[in-house]
């Protein structure tokens, strides 16, 4: 391994932070601490969300305890916009009234609170947004979303049921996303936008045991406009759905689960037509937002916060090449939450081992998939407790992203600092892990780091590893 010290140069040192930290600790205290103690020069500020991981305090305090700053009490977050939306931008969407009703933010606009004070200190402010915005498992979601008729804009699955996420083909919902971002870009002196897209594709959903969509009326119309036979695609997905349900129930297949899956897929190729249609419409949203930001303010950076499942899942890895993303992103932030990564891998593998890789032992499947994905980490039975090694995992993913973008976009590595754990045996974060992750980024040639997922759950003593590395 190349263990040399990274070159001394101007670095992008960002941190994802929720609005509540500025209320709990005070704007000046937070900014001075992050700049003077840690070395932060960019805030990735969550401005719109119904997810505690983006807008609240620690969502894993019951397991991890409270950090060494902030308010050590659960936050009864209701979610929404933590700035004052400009009504002129929302005349053509049902989501015009989405201002947060959290009492802590009554009369407070987080962008007006933070941006001027940050700029006085030479700190840039990017808005940080994640889709899905609502009821996202593992992200501390608000239990109730107080937006009338939102439930009617949901996806429809292949069984005809309203799904768990709004349909991004629904014109009113898609226009709201456009309007919400244009509002912030035009009306506030922000320095950039980071957008995260974490939707499961139809194949994703099938492998996880669900019934995929989107068969809502707007999505069907878009498919027909592209010459797609919607019903044939739905029937093909039903065949795959039946197979996945049988595999999960333990049915024995003469040729094994993997070969049987491939046979069903090849016999029903329309399922891949729907997968491709869904994927392109999903990417279209990213492309639209890039264009929107550039039309409003051509100099404003727009980047992608890239799901770690894209390097843990061979199907997603094939679907989301880095080179393509440089066509609609100025920077990418690969998520490499190293101490949490073993738990994430275990969950990802469990989906495959319930269905198409059911005949493989966990360590067999892990070793094979690691080889395919270019990962070199601990054996499966040690992985959750040890996490993934910064010197191999963070360095390797940074090098991979740099090769992929080929100089056409910046690479800011997403460094996990006290990312929420859901299992007591999951590796804990430490100052050393954080230090080695930052060092690994710069040794690989990365352009910067983004400490994530939320300052409200980070220990300052662990963030000291960033300062040590810098």
For each feature predicted by the language model, list its residue ranges.
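Aromatic- and acidic-residue-enriched segments that line the glycan-binding/catalytic groove
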Residues: 53-80, 133-160, 196-262, 345-363
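Catalytic domains of carbohydrate-active enzymes, especially glycoside hydrolases
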Residues: 28-56, 70-83, 183, 187-192, ...
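Active-site-adjacent "subsite" loops/lids of carbohydrate-active enzymes
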Residues: 8-23, 81-116, 126-188, 212-228, ...
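Aromatic- and acid-rich polysaccharide-binding/catalytic face
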Residues: 196, 234-272, 319-386, 446-457
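Substrate-binding cleft of secreted/luminal carbohydrate-active enzymes
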Residues: 41-53, 328-347, 374-468
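Aromatic-lined carbohydrate-recognition surfaces of secreted/lumenal glycan-active proteins
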Residues: 16, 123-136, 194-198, 229-254, ...
């Amino acid at each position: 391994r190349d263990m040399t010290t990274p070159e001394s140069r101007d670095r992008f040192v960002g941190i994802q932070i929720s609005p509540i930290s500025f209320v709990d600790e005070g704007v000046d205290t937070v900014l001075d601490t992050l700049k003077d103690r840690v070395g932060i020069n960019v805030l990735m500020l969550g401005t719109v969300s119904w997810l505690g991981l983006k807008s609240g305090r620690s969502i894993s305090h019951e397991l991890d305890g409270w950090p060494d700053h902030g308010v050590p009490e659960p936050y009864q977050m209701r979610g929404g916009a933590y700035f004052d939306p400009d009504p002129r931008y929302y005349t053509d969407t049902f989501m015009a009234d989405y201002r947060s009703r959290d009492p802590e933010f009554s009369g407070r606009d987080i962008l007006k609170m933070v941006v001027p004070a940050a700029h006085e200190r030479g700190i840039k402010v990017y808005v940080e947004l994640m889709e899905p915005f609502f009821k996202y498992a593992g992200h501390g979601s608000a239990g109730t979303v107080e937006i009338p008729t939102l439930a009617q804009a949901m996806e429809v699955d292949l069984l005809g049921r309203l799904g768990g996420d709004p349909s991004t083909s629904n014109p009113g919902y898609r226009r709201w996303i456009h309007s919400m971002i244009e509002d912030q870009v035009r009306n506030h002196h922000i320095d950039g936008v980071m957008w995260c897209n974490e939707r499961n594709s139809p194949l994703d959903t099938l492998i996880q045991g669900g019934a995929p969509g989107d068969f809502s009326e707007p999505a069907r119309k878009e498919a027909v406009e592209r010459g797609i036979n919607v019903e044939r695609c739905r029937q093909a997905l039903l065949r795959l759905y039946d197979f996945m349900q049988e595999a999960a129930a333990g049915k024995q297949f003469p040729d094994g689960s993997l070969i049987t899956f491939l046979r069903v897929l090849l016999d029903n190729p329309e399922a891949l037509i729907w997968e491709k249609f869904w994927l392109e419409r999903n990417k279209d949203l990213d492309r639209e937002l890039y264009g929107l930001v550039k039309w409003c303010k051509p100099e404003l950076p727009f980047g992608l916060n890239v799901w770690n499942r894209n390097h843990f899942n061979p199907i997603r890895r094939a679907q989301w090449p880095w080179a393509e993303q440089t066509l609609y992103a100025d920077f990418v932030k690969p998520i490499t939450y190293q101490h949490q990564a073993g738990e994430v891998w275990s969950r990802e593998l469990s989906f495959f081992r319930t269905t198409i890789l059911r005949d493989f032992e966990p360590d067999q499947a892990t070793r094979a998939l690691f080889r395919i994905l270019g990962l070199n980490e601990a054996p499966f039975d040690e992985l959750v407790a040890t996490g993934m090694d910064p010197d191999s995992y963070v360095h390797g993913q940074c090098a991979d992203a740099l090769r992929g973008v080929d100089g056409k976009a910046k690479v800011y590595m997403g460094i996990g600092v006290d990312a929420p754990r859901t299992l007591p045996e999951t590796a804990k974060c430490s100052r050393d892990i954080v230090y080695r992750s930052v060092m690994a980024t710069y040794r690989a040639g990365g352009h910067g780091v983004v400490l994530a997922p939320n300052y409200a759950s980070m220990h300052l003593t662990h963030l000291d590893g960033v300062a040590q590395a810098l």
